[in-house]
Amino acid sequence: MTFPPEGTSMRYSFRTLRSKLFFAAVLVSPITSLAQSDSKLRSNYVVSVQDLKLAGKGHAAFDKGSRLLEKGDTAGSVAYLERAISESPEHYKAYYDLGVAYFRLGHLAEAEQAFQKAIDLTGGGFAPPQFALGAIFCQKQEFLLAETILQRGVEIESGSAIGKYYLASAQLGLNRLVEAERSAEQALVRNANLAEAYLLLARIHQRQRNAPAVARDLEVYLKMDTHKEFARRMADKIQQEMAQDTAAAVIAAIRP
């Protein structure tokens, strides 16, 4: 992508890029934590005839690949997950974990295909790949499609903080700020330790020009986020953007 894209103004292209960078930043952390914590989500998925058929098929390769993924050896997990799929083509959990691995490696097209396959194999009855696919569509700024997929996932896993978080991201992208704020707050009700939700709320409140709320969101976020350097950079970035937006509004108001 050229910068700025031909045929657009510098200001427009900067805002578009800024939005893409924001969604890339906030989506990376939860999607990896989703892979590490989805054992609880998986346990909530009703064991079906399909699960029983999968017992034993590709099990060893899947377990090895999943363990490597959880330990952070993303590249090493791929071969085992692909082997599990070759041994058991209906192994939807292997497709899901493979999608997570591809996402971490930056191979979004392959991740999208793997998540979609997991959805297809379960007839849309397994929420995690729907959350992950919605996250990818948010990152691609296909927000309407993301919202549709995420709504389906939330209907399956209504108690999922991750699902509500991504839904808020899609609604922010659609500029439906009241709905986005509600979804982000619901994510925090489900998981009060989801620091990224406070960062997302700061973005929502920034769009609403609610400076006191932004300040509160960032204060909580900085206290919670363990990656302090990244958290401080993101907080500083939002504060700078608010100052720029305020200055631009003042200049526009005083111009004849």
Residue locations for each model-derived region?
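TPR-adjacent "capping" and linker segments in tetratricopeptide-repeat scaffold/adaptor proteins
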Residues: N44-A60
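Structural signature of tandem alpha-helical TPR/SEL1-like repeats
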Residues: E70-E82, R104-K117, K140-R152, L174-Q186, ...
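Terminal, low-structured helical/coil segments at or just beyond the last alpha-helical repeat
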Residues: D38-V49, R207, P212-P256
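Structural marker of alpha-solenoid helical repeat scaffolds
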Residues: E87, L121-T122, I156, R190, ...
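Helix-start (N-cap) detector for alpha-helical repeat units in TPR-like alpha-solenoids
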Residues: D51, G58, Y92-K93, F126-P128, ...
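Canonical tetratricopeptide repeat
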Residues: D97, F131-A132, Y166, L200, ...
